[in-house]
Amino acid sequence: MKKNIVLTLLLFCAASLGAQNWEPLFNGKNLKGWKKLNGKAEYKIVDNAIVGISKMGTPNTFLTTSKNYGDFILEFDFKIDDGLNSGVQLRSESKKEFKKGRVHGYQFEIDPSQRAWSGGIYDEAR
């Protein structure tokens, strides 16, 4: 009997977790819920996608969510021009007391160069 109660409780908890609503990070229309930090790159929406336009010779620019998230699944496609170095930050922060608000934390590397480090994860700015 105890095993049945525990199993029933576990199944109920698992069903409750699966029933939670997903919250998309990007609505496909505008940058509501996002903010730009640090550099001077521009971001716009083209064909339901976020497009970043680099400003050569300026510090790294970060487009961040306005809200913090706990557990998440991040899926994305990317296109990048040759010669650029880019990435997607995850579990990163920007605090005034750390290098004047410099975004720091883990980055999923997007690297079209010969070394081809795309997919690598490194610690940005620390």
PLM segments and residue spans:
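Sec-dependent N-terminal signal peptides
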Residues: N4-A14
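Structured alpha-helical
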Residues: M1
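Carbohydrate-interacting regions of secretory-pathway proteins
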Residues: A19-R126
